[in-house]
Amino acid sequence: MQTSIHLSLSLSTALLLTACGGGGGGDNNPPLDPGTPPANIPGNNAGNSVNGIYRGTAVVVPSGSTINGSHRTLNIGSDNLNTLNVNGKQFNLRPVNENGSITTTNIRSRDGKSYEIFVVSNFDYQNSRYGYIKSGNEDYIFSQGAPTARMPGSGIAQYVGQAAFVRNGDAGTGDSRFTADFAAKTLNGTITSKSSSVTFTPVNINATINGNSFATANGAAVSSGGHFYGDNARELGGLFSDTVQRLSGSFGAIRQ
């Protein structure tokens, strides 16, 4: 199955599919600790096998390219939340600044690698990392974390977070808000801009929850896919693409 995410990227700054069924009750208290991920997580559409307790997906394209069906969504895995392993390369995702929830940093060199743009979620996210990286001649968009081992089977939860996005070579950050109905298996949310360089009408995401993953329907104007992370679905994160507004990015949010 080919994931339908079309991302127009000229700047990039930081979805695993499991068979974990819904269980547990409707406890809506925000959990504090990451859950133990299942030992074996089946690969998603990418087809490549990975190792590590932190799982997710990434898209890698030559800088300035438009992501389309010819670009594969890659499974990614790591034993360190702050390490991104993709295409045989390793990137340090440890936030440069410890304050706030998402940071944009124009770092030029780190661990022997050069960067033009480095945008990654911060320590508010205990179980996941997401964002963009532009390094060398390649652009990266990614989301990874500790997949929720036991999903709530009922209850409604609110999630508040941030997003990083790009359009026509301009990158920016914004806010994300989601409502998860675990009994109805629905996730509905909105991404809004806080950036003066990238403005757009709110992006609406309407997805179906399947195990600890969620995805929009095929052919939706806004395509998105992602996962719940941590104990009791404490966090969520994923990728999105709005083909009408030619906008794409990654997002994360924390259960309130």
What are these regions (language model features)?
Residues 1-9:
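Bacterial N-terminal signal peptides that target proteins for export
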